[in-house]
Amino acid sequence: LPMMNLIQLDSIKVTAAQGKMPIYSERDVFQVMRQTITLPYGVVTDISPDIKLVLSNAGHILGSATCHFHIGNGDHNFVYTGDIKYGRSMLLESAYTNYPRVETLLIESTYGAKEDIQPSRQEVETAFISSVNSVLKDGGKVLIPIPAVGRAQELMMVIDKYMKSGELTEAPVFMEGMIQEATSIHESFPEYLVRELKQKILETDDNPFDSEYFTNVEHPNDRDEPLREGTPCIIIATSGML
């Protein structure tokens, strides 16, 4: 629910900044929040006399879910999902798909074509670390535009991991936009994160989101500071802050 609120309010700001008319107002968002009922994963909920709903982890972003509708007395089972991710990440478990029965599936199709074969995670991480090291060792600054929800937190974990291991050159990492707000929400719901990350947040002093490498740029007047300084650094920013 907090993540939904953050994303919807940000959408209003982005739309207005583009000179367009938002399709809903802040008042609409607050009204939706008051009328929203949250459901945990894996719980059967009667949403009408003959339809039952079960939400399951979609593996996309924090709180994302697939919707399994059991219609009638077992007459039909329908699954709807938006974005899904089958691979387990450093942040979330892979999407749940172990449904007893499914007659109809409505599914998103990003990267769904035969030629949409993505490189392995290790290949991507190796290439990323190599590129960043090249810039930092030359005294440069690395600007990484990224969505604030999901990918930013995953990237934070990658940077923290490789800097601690010595494979990535240590440098200050500045974060802009609503990344910090989204990260705080992740820390507030560790039960929805992968087991290893949940344990780090709850049981140790090794929370990667609180890493010494990260600095949040809170005020617009501070945005130029990382650029003025002559030291190498990494800047992680949402598109609205570029």
Segments the model singles out, each with a brief description of its role:
Residues L1-E154, D160-E167, P172:
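His/Asp/Glu-rich metal-coordinating catalytic cores
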